[in-house]
Amino acid sequence: MENLNRKKAIKIELANPDTIRSWSHGEVLKPETINYKTLKAEKDGLFDERIFGPTKNYECVCGRYKKANPMNKGKKCEKCGVELTESIVRRERMGHIELEEPVTHIWMLKVAPYRIAAILDLKAKELEEVVYFVSHIVLEQGNQKHFVEKEVLDLGSSRITKTREKLQLTILDVIDLINDPNHRDTKKANRLLEELKNTAVPFSIDEATSLISKYTGAKFGIGARAVEYLLEKVDLTKEIEAIKIQLENSKKTPNERTKLLKRLETFDSLKRSKQRPEWMVMRVIPVIPPDIRPIIQLDGGRFTTSEINDLYRRIIIRNERLKKVKEMGAPSIIVNNEKRMLQEAVDALFDNERKPKPVQRKNKRPLKSLTSVLKGKQGRFRQNLLGKRVDYSARSVIAIGPDLKMYQAGLPREMAITLFKPFVIQWLQDHEYAENVKIAEKMLLQNDPKVWEALEQVIKDRPVLLNRAPTLHRLGIQAFEPKLVKGKAIRLHPLVTTAFNADFDGDQMAVHVPITKEAVAESRALMLGSSAILGPKDGKAIVTPGQDIILGNYYLTTEEKNAKGQGMIFSSLDEAFMAYDSGQIHLNSLIGIALSALPEQKFSDKNQRLNSYLLTTVGKLYFNQIFDDNFPWINSNNIWNAKEAVKEFIYYFSQDINNVIENIQVQQPIKKKELSLIIERYFETHGARKTAEMLDKMKDLGFSFSTKSGTTISAGDVVAFTHKYDEFKEADQKVEQITDFYNMGMLTNSEKKRRIIEVWSDVKDKIQDELATVLRKDVKNPIFVMVDSGARGNISNFTQLVGMRGLMNDTKGDIKEIPIKSSFREGLTVSEYFVSTHGARKGMADIALKTADSGYLTRRLVDVSQEIVVVNEDCEPSKGFEVSAIIDTKHDNVIVPLKDRLVGRFTFEDIYDDDKNLVAFANTLIDKNIAEKIIMSGISSVVIRSVLTCDNKRGVCQKCYGLNLATASVVNIGEPVGVIAAQSIGEPGTQLTMRNFHTGGVAGNVDITQGLPRIKELLDVTTPKGAVAIISEVDGVVSEIEDYNGVFVINIVTENEEVKKYKTEFNSVLRVEQGSSVVAGQKLTEGAIDLHQLLEFGGIQDVQNYILKEVQKVYRLQGIEISDKYIEIIIKQMLNKVKITDGGDSDLLPGEVITIQNYKEVVQDCIVKSIRPPLSKAQIFGIKKAPLESSSWLSSASFQDTARVLTRAIIKGKEDKLEGLKENIMLGNLIPAGTGLTGTQEVEQLAEQYHNNEY
C-alpha cells in the first residue's frame, strides 16, 4: 500500500513579505518574554499566547476557560483573545516583526558568491559599505554627467579626494543651472564648494546630495533601502540578454568570463524560479514558534532561555527605538546609526558567526544564531534529523558467552525486563494474570514469578539488535535471539567479535529492540548473527576462529608417533571414542578405523570400503564429526583437494599398520589458514545457516580441547640464546668501519645512516632465522605451538623475547641507527628503554589521529555515494570496461592479479582465446572456475560489465555490479551498494599508515605519499604532495632528451611533425627514453599524476584506471584486499558531472554543472528537435566537493558549507525530489533501498521460515 504520509518532494525559495505575513498569527511588538511574578506570557511579547497558541491544552491565559475541554476547540476566549486548542500548536505557529526600515539578508550579502553584489554588478566590499551606512550610492543619474548609476560615493578611504572632485564639478553645474548669484541655494553651493576644496574641512554629504538631487533629478541613497530600490529596478530578462551578448565578445579575459557566468547563473535561476531580487531585502521578519526557542525554569527560581530569544529581543528593542527616533525628527546621523544597528541585529539573528564582531554572552562566546542551529555536528541536520535517539535501548559491558549459539546473545535479566516491559505487560493482560496496565506494572515492581515466565515467552518472538561503536561497516549492527543470563554483562558469541571488532577488555555495546512486525522480520531475515559469515569488503569469511579455538583444533589434529595405543584398529567410531575415554589411546596416536564405519559420501572410491582402514587419530575423528556427510574427510592440511588427498591414508587390512606408521611422516596439524579455507569451502557448498551450525561445533571442540591440551607459558619455555653475541661483535666492527669512512668524508650522512641500518637489520634477520630453526626442533614448546598454529604471536615477537629487539623508530617515524641488543628476557638497559619509548609513543599518538581521519574519510565517502542503489536487473549498456592485472610498472610486480578482478563480475561480450575457442558467453557471471579457465587460456585482458559504464539514469543494475560479496550471490534489487562501497573502503582506513613512506633521501628514488594521506590525496583530487609527474599532452615519439646538469628537456614529435617540449624538475627520474612512443596522458617522469591534468590530456578512462590502480596499490601494500567494484562506485560519483562550455540552443547555460545522464538527455532532445545541442567538458570532483554538487540540496546542506548550499538552493528555487537515502531519513520516509524499495512481503516470509528452523 502506498504510504499517504510519504512526502514526494521539498522545495526551498525566498519568502516575500506577503508570504511571511501569511505564515504569521500576529505581530510581536514587545521584547518581553514572560512576567516574572505570574510566569505567564506577556501580551504582544515573544511568547504571547494570543499569537502562538495556549501553553496548556484548551486553557486560556486569563483563567476563564480553566478546565481542558476538547469540545471548545477552535473557540477564542472572549476576554483575553487566546484560541482554545492543543498546546502543540506552539511548535508550529509563527509570528512576525514589521521592520521600521528594510534590511538585507546576511546570506545574500555575505555568503560567497555574494548574490546581491552579483546582481548589482558591484564589489562585495563596496556593497557592504552601502548597507552598513558608510557610503552613499547613486540610484538615478538624472541629468548630471559626473556620477553614473550604481556608483558608490566612498568617503572613508583614499578615494575620498576623487569623490570630493566629482561633487565640486557637479555643484558647479548646479550653480550654472540656478543661474542666480543671490539665490539661497547658490550661497549654499558656494559654501559647500569651499568645504570640498579644502580636504581638511569636513562637509555634509547629505546636504550636497540633496542640493544635487533638487536641480539635476539625480537620486542618492544609503543603507538597505537604497539596495532595495536598485534591486526593484532590475529587469531579469534584459540583464540575461545583455550578459549573453557580452559573453560572445571573445576579448574578455577568463576572469571576466567567470564573473559574467556567475551573474548569468544568478539571473537565470531567479527568472526560472519566478523570484524577485528585491525579496533579498526584508521588510518583515518571521518569528519562529516559541516551543522551538523555549524559556525553561531551573531549580532555585532562575530561568534559562534559548539564545535566539535574546537575538529577537535586540531586534524588537532597536526597531522600537528607530521608530521613536524618527518620530522625534532626530538628525540623519542618529537615524542612520539606529538603522545600521537594526541591520546588525537582524544579521546576528540569521548568522551571528559571520559578523566581524558577533554578539557575545558574558563568557565571550558568540550567541547561537539560526544558522548555527542548522550547521555542524550538533546542528539540526546532523544531530536531530539524520540521527535520532530511540525509545527502547540499553547499554552494558560485554563478556564472552562460550555456550551461546551463533544466533544468540545473552541479555542480563534486569536489562531484558526493562527493555521488553510493554510486551510483558501485554502478555500478562492477554493471559489474564493482570486485569489492567496498573496491576501488571505492580507485578513487575514486586518481581512476581509470572513476570519472568512472561519475559521468557515474549523474547522468543523478538530478536534484539546489538551495536558496537564505532559502526564502521554493516556488520557493526547484528541481530540475535536473546537468551536470559545472570549478572549485568551482555554475553557475546566469541565468533562474532571480529565483525564488531570487539574484545572483552571493557568494551561496551548497545542493545536495541525492533518494535514493528516488519522490523522484527527484517532483523530475522537479513541481520541475524548466524547469517553474517562473509565480510562485505572482500567476500572472505569474517567469522574465522581465533586464539583458543585455533589452539584446541591444532592440538586435536596433531599426530604423534609412539604415543599410547598406537597401531590399534577400530571397527566403529564409538569403539574408538570409548577407547579414548577409558584412557587406552592418546588423542594424537596414529590408529586405524574401518572405512565401512565412516560415511561413504566422504570418499571417492566406493570399492575399497569393506576391506580397508583409514590411518588417522582420534582427534581427527572428533574433528570430522563437526561436518555433515557430504563434506570430504579432512585428514591432512590439503583442504581444496581433500577428497583426493585422503586416498593416501587408506590402506588394506592386509597391510600391517605398524609397518605403515613406521614408514610415513606425520601430517601437519590444522592451522588458522586451513580453518579459514574449511569455512570458505563449507560456505560455498552448504550456505550460511549450515556453516553457522558447523562453526558452533568447531568452537565447542576448540574450547574443549584447548582446555584439555593444558597449554601454559612460562619463562622456562623461552629458550636461552647466547649465540647472538658473536653476531653483535661482527656487526660492531662493521659499524665502526662505516663511521671511519664517514669521518674521512667518503660517505654522506644519509649513506652512513642507511648502511648502519642495513647492518643491524641483517643481524636481526639472521638471529630470527636461527631462532626459528631452534624453535622448530621443539614441536611441543607452547610458544611454538601458539605461533605455528596462528593462535597468537609470531616469530618476530619470539625474536624480541630471546634474541634482540632490533632497530626502533624515532618520533618522526624514521629508523634510528642505534639498535636495542637486549631481549625482553634479559631486560633492557635504561638507555635502550629510552630509545624504544619514542616509537611506541608515536604509535599511540598516530592511532588516535588515524581513527579520526579514517572516520571522516568514511563520512565523506558515504556522502558522495549514498544515493547509489541497485534499481533493476540489466541496463543493457553500450560499452564495457576493460580489465587486466594491475601491475606496478615501476617495480614490475603484480598488485591485483586478473583473477581477483574477474571473480564475481559479469562478462560484457563473448570471450575467445587465441585459437578462437569460446571461453565464456556475454553476460555470464564469472565464478572461480570460469576465471581459472580464462587465465589458463592465456587471455590477459577481459571486457567486463562495470558500474563505471552502467547506463542507468539513477543507481546501477544487477549485472553491472555483479556479486554481493557478503552473500556470495548476485546482488539483490534495492541493495544500497553505494553505502556498502563507502564502508568497505573506509572500514580498513584505520589499518592504513599515517606515515608518508619516504625513502630517506636515497638517490634515484622518488618520495611518494602512501597510506591514508595518499588515499585522501586521490579521492579529494588535490595536487599531489612530493614529486608530481610530468605527463604528455600529445601522442608522439620522444625525439631527443637534452640534459642541462640534471634538468632534462624532453622533445616529443607528433604525427603532424610538431615538437612539444617538456622541462623537468632538477634530478627527476625519467620514465621514457629516446625513441619511446608515448600517448597523451602518459607519464614522462616519476611521481604522482595530477588528476585534473590527466583528465584534460588523457580522458575519463585514463583517470578511472589511474585512481583504481593507485587506491588498490595503497590497500594491497598494507595487505588489505578490497574489491574493485567499491572503488569503481566512488570513481563513478567523482566523474559523473560535466560542465557546459556552450549552451547551444538548449536551456543550459555555459558554466553550468550537470550530471552526464541529464546532459545526454538534453543532447538527444536537441537532436530530435533539430536544434544545436550543448557542448560540455568532463569534470572531476573530489569527495569533498562532489556531495556539494549533488542534485539534492538537503543532502548537500547536511554535509558541509550549510549556508552556502542553502543560499544557492534558495536562488534556484530548488526542488529536492528525495531520491537519495539521506534526504528521506531527514523527512522520516522509508529509504528508497532494501525493503523500502521492494516491500517487506518477501522478507516476512523468510523470517517466518527462519523462526521455525534453529539456525
Swiss-Prot record:
Q: Which GO terms describe its molecular function?
A: DNA binding; DNA-directed RNA polymerase activity; magnesium ion binding; zinc ion binding
- UniProt entry tagged with the keyword Metal-binding: yes
Under Pfam families, the record lists: RNA_pol_Rpb1_1, RNA_pol_Rpb1_2, RNA_pol_Rpb1_3, RNA_pol_Rpb1_4, RNA_pol_Rpb1_5
User: Which Gene3D superfamilies does this entry report, sorted A to Z?
Assistant: 1.10.132.30, 1.10.150.390, 1.10.1790.20, 1.10.40.90, 2.40.40.20, 2.40.50.100, RNA polymerase II, clamp domain, RNA polymerase Rpb1, domain 3
List ligand-binding residues for Mg(2+).
Answer: 503, 505, 507
Q: Which reaction does it catalyse?
A: RNA(n) + a ribonucleoside 5'-triphosphate = RNA(n+1) + diphosphate
Record key words, sorted: DNA-directed RNA polymerase, Magnesium, Metal-binding, Nucleotidyltransferase, Transcription, Transferase, Zinc
Chain sites annotated for binding Zn(2+) 1: 60, 62, 77, 80
Residues the entry annotates as binding Zn(2+) 2: 875, 950, 957, 960
Q: How is the cofactor bound?
A: Binds 1 Mg(2+) ion per subunit.
Cofactors named for this entry: Mg(2+); Zn(2+)
Example GO CC term: the record gives: DNA-directed RNA polymerase complex
Q: What EC number(s) would the UniProt record show? A: 2.7.7.6
Its family remark reads:
Belongs to the RNA polymerase beta' chain family.
Q: How does it assemble?
A: The RNAP catalytic core consists of 2 alpha, 1 beta, 1 beta' and 1 omega subunit. When a sigma factor is associated with the core the holoenzyme is formed, which can initiate transcription.
Functional note: DNA-dependent RNA polymerase catalyzes the transcription of DNA into RNA using the four ribonucleoside triphosphates as substrates.
What is the designated name of this protein? Answer: DNA-directed RNA polymerase subunit beta'
